[in-house]
Amino acid sequence: ASAYLDMVARLWEGPIILVGHSKGGNLAIYAAMNADPKVRKRIQHVYSLDGPGFPPEIVTSPAYRTIQPKVTKIVPSSSIVGMIFETPEPCRVVSSDSDGIMQHSAFTWLLDGDQFITEPDLSSSSQLFNEELNHWIATLTPEQRERAVDALFTVLASQDYAAIQGTLESSYQICMSHRVDHR
């Protein structure tokens, strides 16, 4: 991602704004963190649209701390994907005309003219689910974390809503059993 950003930056001399949805939001932040220093100076802002965060070792790194002031994360009120891992950057919570994981589609986010309709915070169910999911993810090895996140994105990319709902119900049961077993 950073090599691609550096290549495109050679074709454009002006200021740069990066935007990505889902895994693309994560990659936009990653690219900004790892871009050539001259390119990094041209980055005005990075928008992550319901993109996952990063593990603690990344968000505490100097590269992340350098780019963090330029990052805004935009998530729907029932965000799951955008709240995976650490999310220290400011989040704008937006309204959606869908429920649950279906809010991940930015096409469901509500607008008033050319502005998002915002909410004061994530829904309480989203906050609880994300707390438990991230607690469970923290117990995984890096390889297991990578496989778990890749599996989630594979299911999301398939747009098989029954599979997505089943995956979330299983994840919820795993998280809640982990909560009972480990508290």
State what each model feature region is:
Residues 2-15, 37-183:
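Alpha/beta hydrolase fold serine-hydrolase catalytic domain that processes acyl esters and thioesters
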Residues 19-24, 28:
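Gly/Ala-rich beta-loop-alpha elbow adjacent to hydrolase catalytic centers
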Residues 27-37:
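Short glycine-enriched nucleophile-adjacent loop
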